[in-house]
Amino acid sequence: GVVDILKGAAKDIAGHLASKVMNKL
């Protein structure tokens, strides 16, 4: 459903942001 899609997108975005932060450290 739409909620599942939004949850998946949120996880992907969070993963990308986490990767960027880890790369800066």
From Swiss-Prot:
Record's keyword terms, sorted: Amidation, Amphibian defense peptide, Antibiotic, Antimicrobial, Antiviral protein, Fungicide, Secreted
Gene Ontology cellular component annotations, sorted alphabetically: extracellular region
Cellular compartments annotated: Secreted
Tissue note: Expressed by the skin glands.
Major site of localization recorded for this protein: secreted
Modified residues (Leucine amide): L25
UniProt keyword annotation of Transferase present: no
GO biological process, one term: symbiont-mediated hemolysis of host erythrocyte
Domain of life, source organism: Eukaryota
Other remarks on this protein: The primary structure of this peptide is identical to that of Ocellatin-F1 from Leptodactylus labyrinthicus (AC C0HKF0). The cross-references to PDB can be found in this entry (AC C0HKF0).
Family that this chain belongs to: Belongs to the frog skin active peptide (FSAP) family. Ocellatin subfamily.
Protein name, as recorded: Ocellatin-F1
